[in-house]
Amino acid sequence: VHWTAEEKQLITGLWGKVNVDECGAEALARLLIVYPWTQRFFASFGNLATASAITGNAMVHAHGKKVLTSFGEAVKNLDNIKNTFAQLSELHCDKLHVDPENFKLLGDILIIVLAAHFGKDFTPDCQAAWKKLVRVVAHALARKYH
């Protein structure tokens, strides 16, 4: 994947402002609410029966932070995303059996969360760069499935 200097700047510039705890929790909660079938991968998280139960669930918050923290590794390693996510791809494929389509869904949700949090700073060019990034990350996570 080739990144232009502008794309790199748009991604890293916005990432520096992201509250990983808040945005991570919100992104995972939105995934579980908007795409309820994804809840089956989080059965050990307890009550996910309602939107308020999901948004108030400490395990959802903790895992959302973990997911977004790991996403930060992509931002730090834009030129080596495949290798950065090799172990996570293996884990999600071989042990967790996560449908790789869910990585794309989470990427789409992350775009919505970033747009909501950053408003005017999340310009169309910024959105395009982030859309490219979430697709590259989703592809890297799905790599072991192919």
From Swiss-Prot:
PROSITE patterns: GLOBIN. Pfam families: Globin. GO terms for cellular component: blood microparticle; haptoglobin-hemoglobin complex; hemoglobin complex. GO terms for biological process: hydrogen peroxide catabolic process. The keyword Iron applies. Heme b binds at H63, H92. CDD domains: Hb-beta-like. Keywords: Heme, Iron, Metal-binding, Oxygen transport, Transport. GO terms for molecular function: haptoglobin binding; heme binding; metal ion binding; organic acid binding; oxygen binding; oxygen carrier activity; peroxidase activity. Red blood cells. Residues 2-146 form the Globin domain. InterPro entries: Globin (IPR000971), Globin-like_sf (IPR009050), Globin/Proto (IPR012292), Hemoglobin_b (IPR002337), Hemoglobin_oxygen_transport (IPR050056). Involved in oxygen transport from the lung to the various peripheral tissues. Heterotetramer of two alpha chains and two beta chains. Belongs to the globin family. This is Hemoglobin subunit beta. The lineage of its organism: Eukaryota, Metazoa, Chordata, Craniata, Vertebrata.
